[in-house]
Amino acid sequence: MNSDISNISLDATPRLTSLSHGGGCGCKIAPGVLSELLAKSNLPKQFFPDLLVGTETADDAAVYKINDEQAIVATTDFFMPIVDDPYDFGRIAATNALSDIYAMGGTPLMALAIVGMPINVLPHDVIAKILEGGESVCRDAGIPLAGGHSIDSVEPIYGLVGIGIVNPKQMKRNADAKDGDVLILGKPLGVGILSAALKKNLLDDAGYRAMVDATTKLNRPGTELAKLDGVHALTDVTGFGLLGHGLELARGAQLSARIDSAKLPMLPGVQALAEQGIFTGASGRNWASYGEHVELASSLTDAQKALLTDPQTSGGLLVSCTQDVVHQVLQVFADSGFAEAAVIGRMEAGAPKVFVG
């Protein structure tokens, strides 16, 4: 008999994280593999004049122009459990999905649920709590959860289709950063490291609360930031880590991104866990996918390197803006409760790479 009972709760309900091989945005297909898969399509590219944002720059959402003042923002995001509490899982997944709309400078209008559950394994009241958590976030965002689709799945999967609206003149892409822009990160890093610690039963209550609080905070500032003329580009930092999404900014603008590792905000307890070698498998896959396009200072420790590739679930907005609006950007974050938003680097002329010092 297997004496390991760590995956079984007192009421014999399996831990959600024990039912999946990955969790949160760490479930993403590695960026290098994804690029290879997408490149295999033999279908000719089609041009749609009103499709303002498609797949070209790996942006956060698709944007389709309705008229000169309105465009639809459409996105979808789902994943397997990053935590064991079903209500928290639903909240985190929903917050993460809606983030893509805010990252385009949009305002959410409604959502549809994507549900895949092992119906004969998980009690139905547990599944109901996941759905309730997702709906609670939609209510917080002021939108209806208007429907969805469900399947019987081997692993638990939950997420949303998000539909939003944006003024095309205020829409922010991830490809429009300018030489000399300042980079600002809206949330602290380390979600992947904390989630890895949780799976190993090494995360204390304070660390868990910090992780859940960060991942259930809606990236609402994106809507207001898009109205600032000096904000050139927006994206959110998710499964490909800070380096991966920073590289997307660099490639889109054909510039270099320079990041100061000493200025990176991180969640409580992350530093100590990283120094113990706690990190996700996705962190290594991320580095394998884009490491050749990154230059790291030789002084960086392994723990610092792990933080840079750490997959973020419902991570912070990454803003590229002019120096003269930095104070305004930080104030928008502060007014929405993002006290740890910080200047972390800049964009500069050069090859599309990321430099970390």
Swiss-Prot record:
<keyword id="KW-0067">ATP-binding</keyword>
<dbReference type="GO" id="GO:0005524">
    <property type="term" value="F:ATP binding"/>
</dbReference>
<dbReference type="Pfam" id="PF02769">
    <property type="entry name" value="AIRS_C"/>
</dbReference>
<feature type="active site">
    <location>
        <position position="25"/>
    </location>
</feature>
<comment type="function">
    <text>Synthesizes selenophosphate from selenide and ATP.</text>
</comment>
<dbReference type="InterPro" id="IPR004536">
    <property type="entry name" value="SPS/SelD"/>
</dbReference>
<dbReference type="InterPro" id="IPR016188">
    <property type="entry name" value="PurM-like_N"/>
</dbReference>
<dbReference type="GO" id="GO:0005737">
    <property type="term" value="C:cytoplasm"/>
</dbReference>
<dbReference type="GO" id="GO:0004756">
    <property type="term" value="F:selenide, water dikinase activity"/>
</dbReference>
<comment type="subunit">
    <text>Homodimer.</text>
</comment>
<dbReference type="Pfam" id="PF00586">
    <property type="entry name" value="AIRS"/>
</dbReference>
<feature type="binding site" description="in other chain">
    <location>
        <position position="77"/>
    </location>
    <ligand>
        <name>ATP</name>
    </ligand>
</feature>
<feature type="binding site" description="in other chain">
    <location>
        <begin position="57"/>
        <end position="59"/>
    </location>
    <ligand>
        <name>ATP</name>
    </ligand>
</feature>
<dbReference type="InterPro" id="IPR023061">
    <property type="entry name" value="SelD_I"/>
</dbReference>
<feature type="site" description="Important for catalytic activity">
    <location>
        <position position="28"/>
    </location>
</feature>
<comment type="similarity">
    <text>Belongs to the selenophosphate synthase 1 family. Class I subfamily.</text>
</comment>
<keyword id="KW-0460">Magnesium</keyword>
<keyword id="KW-0808">Transferase</keyword>
<feature type="binding site">
    <location>
        <begin position="148"/>
        <end position="150"/>
    </location>
    <ligand>
        <name>ATP</name>
    </ligand>
</feature>
<dbReference type="InterPro" id="IPR036921">
    <property type="entry name" value="PurM-like_N_sf"/>
</dbReference>
<dbReference type="GO" id="GO:0000287">
    <property type="term" value="F:magnesium ion binding"/>
</dbReference>
<keyword id="KW-0479">Metal-binding</keyword>
<feature type="binding site">
    <location>
        <position position="100"/>
    </location>
    <ligand>
        <name>Mg(2+)</name>
    </ligand>
</feature>
<dbReference type="GO" id="GO:0016260">
    <property type="term" value="P:selenocysteine biosynthetic process"/>
</dbReference>
<protein>
    <recommendedName>
        <fullName>Selenide, water dikinase</fullName>
        <ecNumber>2.7.9.3</ecNumber>
    </recommendedName>
</protein>
<feature type="binding site" description="in other chain">
    <location>
        <position position="100"/>
    </location>
    <ligand>
        <name>ATP</name>
    </ligand>
</feature>
<keyword id="KW-0711">Selenium</keyword>
<keyword id="KW-0418">Kinase</keyword>
<dbReference type="InterPro" id="IPR036676">
    <property type="entry name" value="PurM-like_C_sf"/>
</dbReference>
<feature type="binding site" description="in other chain">
    <location>
        <position position="28"/>
    </location>
    <ligand>
        <name>ATP</name>
    </ligand>
</feature>
<feature type="binding site">
    <location>
        <position position="236"/>
    </location>
    <ligand>
        <name>Mg(2+)</name>
    </ligand>
</feature>
<dbReference type="InterPro" id="IPR010918">
    <property type="entry name" value="PurM-like_C_dom"/>
</dbReference>
<keyword id="KW-0547">Nucleotide-binding</keyword>
<feature type="binding site">
    <location>
        <position position="60"/>
    </location>
    <ligand>
        <name>Mg(2+)</name>
    </ligand>
</feature>
